[in-house]
């Protein structure tokens, strides 16, 4: 004679699944945020710093003025 199967625990099933998935989602989002910071944001920040280190705004302005972009600065 076989014994009866144990009944599955139904109480708190949703809360337990949500807790597990919320922790997983938090870990994935934290990992992606870290990846984005180092793969995209740091490179972009370095590119901006390199550009503005050698940028001459007056030279750029004079080139645009000579090209006739500005109507008020002849």
Curated annotation (Swiss-Prot):
Residues 2-12 are mitochondrial matrix. The keyword Ligase does not apply. Belongs to the cytochrome c oxidase subunit 6c family. The keyword Cell membrane does not apply. The lineage of its organism: Eukaryota, Metazoa, Chordata, Craniata, Vertebrata. It comes from Bos taurus (Bovine). Residues 54-74 are mitochondrial intermembrane. PANTHER family: CYTOCHROME C OXIDASE SUBUNIT 6C. Keywords: Membrane, Mitochondrion, Mitochondrion inner membrane, Transmembrane, Transmembrane helix. Its main location: mitochondrion. It holds the Pfam family COX6C. This is Cytochrome c oxidase subunit 6C. It is a single-pass membrane protein. Component of the cytochrome c oxidase (complex IV, CIV), a multisubunit enzyme composed of 14 subunits. The complex is composed of a catalytic core of 3 subunits MT-CO1, MT-CO2 and MT-CO3, encoded in the mitochondrial DNA, and 11 supernumerary subunits COX4I1 (or COX4I2), COX5A, COX5B, COX6A2 (or COX6A1), COX6B1 (or COX6B2), COX6C, COX7A1 (or COX7A2), COX7B, COX7C, COX8B and NDUFA4, which are encoded in the nuclear genome. One of its GO terms (biological process) is oxidative phosphorylation.
């Amino acid at each position: 004679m076989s014994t009866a199967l144990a009944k599955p625990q139904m109480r708190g099933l949703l809360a337990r699944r949500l807790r597990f998935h919320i922790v997983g989602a938090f870990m994935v989002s934290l990992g992606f945020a870290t990846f984005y910071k180092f793969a995209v944001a740091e490179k972009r920040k370095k590119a901006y710093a390199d550009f503005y280190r050698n940028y001459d705004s007056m030279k750029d302005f004079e080139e645009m003025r000579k090209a006739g972009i500005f109507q008020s600065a002849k």
